[in-house]
């Protein structure tokens, strides 16, 4: 229709808690990006890198400003409509790099507040479930609103093979689970924004 405009795409800031080359968690973000491009209209994944963030030190906050890498990171968080965290599990908890990113984003003014988020995890043992629940606990204080279901935690080292040697997701069933989670995140994020979500996941 003449004069009509397309709805603004929902932008998802996706953060991997692993800095390792070939990380399966970073591979999950790549897979999520591909899924959105191929089959979820109106949703765009922006991979936000965190390797350059310094360890949190409030002495670095000078004249109400932050180091350049932190400023750039916080700008990416502020620009997002919602978040996707891909988290490994280290020693039953959150990885250091991801906790550091959460902490930098929380410095006043809190960049995380009042937006939807989802967590996906690939790890050994329980598949990262303990890490996921610790992120949810941190998110309570940060006013992040996590979707409750579906939960996607992947026992990365159990057969059948789920990732290739570069960390790319190759399991079609997990890709479907990831798509279902992204649709749920999209619906919940739109609800928080007061917009209609034409999806079975909106309920």
From Swiss-Prot:
Its EC number is 1.6.5.2. This is Probable NADPH:quinone oxidoreductase 2. It comes from Oryza sativa subsp. japonica (Rice). Its cofactor is FMN. GO terms for cellular component: cytosol. Homotetramer. GO terms for molecular function: FMN binding; NADH:ubiquinone reductase (non-electrogenic) activity; NADPH dehydrogenase (quinone) activity. The enzyme apparently serves as a quinone reductase in connection with conjugation reactions of hydroquinones involved in detoxification pathways. The keyword Nucleus does not apply. It is an enzyme of class 1 (oxidoreductase).
């Amino acid at each position: 229709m003449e004069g009509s405009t397309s709805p603004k795409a929902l932008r998802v800031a996706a953060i991997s808690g692993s800095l390792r080359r070939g990380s399966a968690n970073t591979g999950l973000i790549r897979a999520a990006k591909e899924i959105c491009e191929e089959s979820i209209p109106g949703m765009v994944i922006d991979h936000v890198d965190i390797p350059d963030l310094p360890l949190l030190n409030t002495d670095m906050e000078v004249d109400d400003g932050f180091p350049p890498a932190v400023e750039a990171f916080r700008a990416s968080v502020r620009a997002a409509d919602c978040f996707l965290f891909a988290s490994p599990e280290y020693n039953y908890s959150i990885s250091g790099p991801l906790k550091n990113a959460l902490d930098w984003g929380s410095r006043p003014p809190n960049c995380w507040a009042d937006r939807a988020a989802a967590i996906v995890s690939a790890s050994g043992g329980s598949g990262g479930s303990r890490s996921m629940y610790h992120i949810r606990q941190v998110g309570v204080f940060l006013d992040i609103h996590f979707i409750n279901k579906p939960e996607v935690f992947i026992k990365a080292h159990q057969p059948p093979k789920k990732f290739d040697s570069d960390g790319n997701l190759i399991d079609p069933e997990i890709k479907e689970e990831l798509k279902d989670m992204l649709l749920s995140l999209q619906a919940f994020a739109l609800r928080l924004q007061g917009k209609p979500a034409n999806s079975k996941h909106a309920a």
